[in-house]
């Protein structure tokens, strides 16, 4: 959840958080409005899972590059508008793979791990997760990016 062009933009993670706990959404909104600080809770287990997830994602990216795929990287530290335009330009140019594709649509924004061009020219979202089984939150996230 963040402000962009004077409005709140939500992400698939925000929707999943709301489905889990409405109060968490209120706290996230207060942080987005700069009404409170985000708690700096240290959680070594969560940090380990995040790091392992990043490694898994990096390994998949390296595999795509090793296969000779044309990979365009969208840097998620860019302005959202710039990142969304760069994603659209990469798709229009026919990039094989777009890494960290940025999508912004009205009240929503998100970054897909990978968007891969299919033989028919359409793009398919590919998300890298450490989980062995799909979870509803993952499916919701993929639906958002696929829409």
Where in the sequence are the language-model features?
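Hydrophobic/aromatic pocket-lining and membrane-interface residues
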Residues: 114-116, 126, 142-145
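Metal-dependent nuclease catalytic cores in nucleic-acid-processing enzymes
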Residues: 132-147
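Glycine- and acidic
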Residues: 124-132
